[in-house]
Amino acid sequence: MVDGRPMQITLNLPDRLNQIGEFDQNDWLREIAIALFEQEHISLARASKISSMEIMEFQKLLSDRGICIHYDVEELAQDIQHLQNRSWL
């Protein structure tokens, strides 16, 4: 709730969902996380955690959907640390 009112989110689901016979709980959590991130209700790290995805994997998913990645200095530092931990940087 925000200021005593329930929070409203809008989900823009991809057209491919019409072609999928089974859409499980993980799929719904991923779509909700994307929507919350895109509407700046949660951080990139939180969205990737909700999606049960690595941050870099979640960033790639956002990029594939044309969603801009917005994050603060702390999240940038976390990304750099993540890359260093994997010896990618």
From Swiss-Prot:
Signal peptide positions (record): none
- Tree of life domain: Bacteria
What does the sequence similarity comment in the record state about its family? Belongs to the UPF0175 family.
Q: What name appears for this protein in its UniProt entry?
A: UPF0175 protein ssl1255
Q: What is the protein's species of origin?
A: Synechocystis sp. (strain ATCC 27184 / PCC 6803 / Kazusa)
**Source organism lineage?**
Bacteria, Bacillati, Cyanobacteriota, Cyanophyceae, Synechococcales
